């Protein structure tokens, strides 16, 4: 059986209408039936055609539409376009703000990283400066010791000259010049011996702080074969060293102050917490006492009797008849006085008075 569509389905007028409507063009043709109801008429009121954006394509050219509606349409379109533009600008600004926030976070992380690195490097620099100062001090001490050791004159370094012994029989020629020279030499030898003794005593007493001995310029050139080096002076602390030391002391003081402040804050918080807990405990104890006092148990009626009424009645009777009538009134009503709760055993389960009496 052939199920292929008939040619009428392809060539029908309705198919042409819907195909042209999909393309955006509505063909003008007569209605399907010649009646008063035209379904393809835009102003018939029954099933009007639906156009793009719910409006007629030729609304501006239509004469039946008033001009106010046309103006409103243009204004609304302008507002919609402006709203879209503003939304796009807001969206772009938000994206820029997010991007800037990301950049700020990266810079903050880098700042913290480099600050930590800077602190570590400063600590290392201070440690290296201390070690270098200690090494320089040790070197200076060693150099001073070596200079002092070299400055002492050994007996082996001198040229031993035999003394001239004059015969008693021979003639001794003594001139005043030779006598003066001999006296000067003897004085110089004595001075050198004294200086060597003083230096030896100083070395034994203070081995760390040594200064080279002052050599006299009047010594003979034969004995001063070795040049005496002057001891290097110890370097004085510079302004940078003083500032670094002061900054370190200030930082240590600031850290101590912060620790003391933290301890004081913790102490105050603990005191306030203690006071608040004590107040809560007092309030809870008052609530327990008030919850237990307003009711008493009566044997005659077998139910709870409020104590406030009886207390008022007893007060009135005591005013009239005295304390004796108040006690008798309690006996007449068979009401036992309330036993106060002991505060030692607050957490125990309460037992009714009937069971207590039975026990």
From Swiss-Prot:
Residues 67-289 form a coiled coil. GO terms for cellular component: cytoplasm; nucleus; spindle pole body. It comes from the Eukaryota. InterPro entries: Spc42. It is found in: Nucleus; Cytoplasm, Cytoskeleton, Microtubule organizing center, Spindle pole body. Residues 195-219 have a biased composition (Polar residues). Pfam families: Spc42p. Residues 123-145, 195-238 are annotated as: Disordered. Its main location: nucleus. Residues 136-145 have a biased composition (Basic and acidic residues). Keywords: Coiled coil, Cytoplasm, Cytoskeleton, Nucleus. Forms a polymeric layer at the periphery of the spindle pole body (SPB) central plaque which has an essential function during SPB duplication and may facilitate attachment of the SPB to the nuclear membrane. Belongs to the SPC42 family. This is Spindle pole body component SPC42. It comes from Candida glabrata (strain ATCC 2001 / BCRC 20586 / JCM 3761 / NBRC 0622 / NRRL Y-65 / CBS 138) (Yeast). The lineage of its organism: Eukaryota, Fungi, Dikarya, Ascomycota, Saccharomycotina.
